[in-house]
Regions:
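A contiguous strand-loop segment
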Residues: 1-86, 113, 118
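Second-shell loop/turn segments in exported
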Residues: 83, 92-98
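Accessory structured domains or lobes within enzymes
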Residues: 101-145
Length: 145
């Protein structure tokens, strides 16, 4: 089980646990502004890099919006791709949101347009996730049940 928390005092804090008894090769990863993906914001967080792509566990962008992908085993449900929708595989959602959204309000609006799919990344199975998003204005939990 993974846990995430936020705390607002003089500054905003966000943290999470990664409750595994082994390592999956996670490391601190920076995705710069000019990375060849949609969006404009730089991102830093914990990720496993596979085939040059950062598979983020959690991260924050340069505007202060943070997001964590948390295990939701047995409860996560993803949809099939739909024509005319913004189809985003579950492994790409965190990076897509943080690259494109500066605030929690923007992230909430963007998530209303997204169809989260269960497409796996290479040989990795689709992770069963829900997400915590937060900035200094508040927090929200997102899932696709």
């Amino acid at each position: 089980m993974c846990t995430a928390v936020t705390y607002q005092a003089a500054a905003f804090y966000m943290g999470r646990t990664l409750d595994y008894d082994c390592s999956f090769g996670e490391e601190v990863v920076i995705t710069p502004r000019k990375f060849p993906l949609p969006g404009d914001y730089a991102v830093i967080g914990m990720a496993h890099v596979a085939d040059g792509y950062p598979l983020y566990y959690d991260a924050v962008n340069e505007k202060g919006l943070g997001m964590a992908g948390l295990n939701f085993v047995g409860n996560a449900k993803y949809r099939q791709p739909e024509d005319g929708r913004c189809n985003v595989p579950q492994y790409a959602l965190l990076l897509r949101v943080l690259r494109q959204c500066a605030t929690l309000a923007q992230a909430r609006a963007f998530l209303q347009t997204v169809n989260v799919t269960g497409e796996p990344f290479g040989q990795y199975p689709a992770a069963e996730l829900h997400w915590l998003l937060a900035d200094r204005t508040g927090a929200l939990a997102a899932d696709r049940r």
